[in-house]
Amino acid sequence: MALRLLVAAFAVAHAFVSPGRALSTPRRPPPRPATTMAARIPWRTVFVCEYTAPLLVFPAVSKAGPFSTLASTLWTVHFAKRLAETLFVHKFSKGTMPLTNLFKNCGYYGGAAALVAWDINRSGPYGAQLAKLFAQLSTKTKVFVGAWAICEVLNLYTHLHLASLRSDGSREAKIPTAWPFRRVCSPNYSFEIGSWIFYSLATRSPAAWAFTTLGAWQMATWSKQKLKRYKRKFKDEEAFTATHALVPGVF
């Protein structure tokens, strides 16, 4: 009788346990089907939209006037350059980004354009004195505008050099060798920040200074991260000589 009960118990256990599986091991549930990935959009498309937004918003908000025209001209040239670089120069290492970034970036740049234009309309220091665009600018303002232009040209130069490193279509990071990169990892950001500093000095706009400060903080963060990546990747390469993120000997 005991033998029959033992055989019956074994048969029941064998029916519920797969061969080779321990009795104490629970069965795993079947894998769930993969969820649909969040919508994504090409980097180039996002850049085109986020640079087009301030080009449209600033002139729409800016009032007619010599000083407002000066501020609008510098603003328009800067973002027109960015847009042209996006279309014809930049080589993106990544293909897509989340679609939500499109609305976030366009809102940021479009909102900044509206705020800076409104602030310059409200408190432009030369609005009542200037009769013609550039005609009666002070020497100090002319120096600021000239320095702004130099930073814009140097920023373009660094972007052209970076694009030349991927002329073969590769997305692999390579060591930049142009003179601005000898001691600084991200001189393109350095000149970008410089152009906004001189724009803020020329316009004397608190809103422009706020936009400059926020942008500089973000670019400094990106530069530090990039320097760490490059130091790991190119630590044994003699061609890599950058020691700082943005400013030689300082940051």
Task: Mark where each language-model region is.
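N-terminal signal-anchor/initial transmembrane insertion module
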Residues: M1-K63
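Non-cytosolic membrane-interface motifs at loop->transmembrane helix junctions
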Residues: G95-N101, A128-L137
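Juxtamembrane helix-capping/reentrant segments at transmembrane boundaries
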Residues: R27-F47, S93-G107, K174-F181, A242-G249
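Hydrophobic alpha-helical transmembrane segments of polytopic
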Residues: L3, V7-F10, W43-Y51, A71-H78, ...
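Hydrophobic transmembrane alpha-helices
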Residues: M1-F16, V57-G65, L130-F251
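Hydrophobic alpha-helical transmembrane segments in multi-pass integral membrane proteins
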Residues: P59, Y109-G127, F191-Y199
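Hydrophobic alpha-helical segments and helix pairs
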Residues: P66-D119
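Juxtamembrane interfacial secondary-structure elements that flank transmembrane helices
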Residues: F16-P31, A80-K94, W118-G127, L156-R166, ...
